[in-house]
Amino acid sequence: MLEGSPNLPQWDNLPLAQQLTEKLNVPVVLENDIRAALVGEMWKGHCRHTHSCALIGIGTGLGSALLMDGKVIRGANNAAGEIGYMMFARDHLFRNWRNKGCFESFCSGSGLSERMASLRGENLSAIEIIQASQQGDPLAQSLVEEMADYLAIGIMNLVAIANLEKVVLTGGITRSADTFLPRVQANLDRHLFANTKVNIELSELWEKGPLYGIAILALATVYPSIQFMPEIQLR
């Protein structure tokens, strides 16, 4: 059942997996892309042998998936990890974030582009803004630094809640992580206590992560007696 997708309101409460199963006459498994990517990281990436970690995807939008005590967290309505809607200041309460979450507005490709357009009137892609920051553009540098600071705050909040062992970053924006990750790490080093220090790593699976993950989930659904990752609760 598809529920609560702000980008697909017309599909809300649609039993898509059931309909596809009936139409194709084969079992169909659906999963959120970032959660599927987390399962991929658990099988073949940086989340192997880890029981508490977060995968944060920074691309056009912002999302995350959480592994806590060996269990993939889904939440009451399958919406756990929607960190794009996190807020960080009192004045954020007085703005409408329904179409794009507060955190996502400051820490995503679309958010970067919208911030540049509102401040300078230029329609640049996030990659163009990052490149401009590398070339010394003051506004672009300020926006990238702002994104890094918000990302650090978001990670610190996740660590405070879940005491994570590791945070893995993925998504198109993280291919330019050398531009902003040192600032993120410096903020984490400055503000996290010694017993909550967390490793930040970049995914090496990229677009293969969700493919690996959904394959594992599909096999686990069709062949539930087989323990693909015995130490992990997938569903």
Features from the language model and the residues they span:
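ATP-binding/phosphotransfer module of carbohydrate and carboxylate kinases, centering on a glycine-rich
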Residues: 18-26, 40-50, 72, 90-235
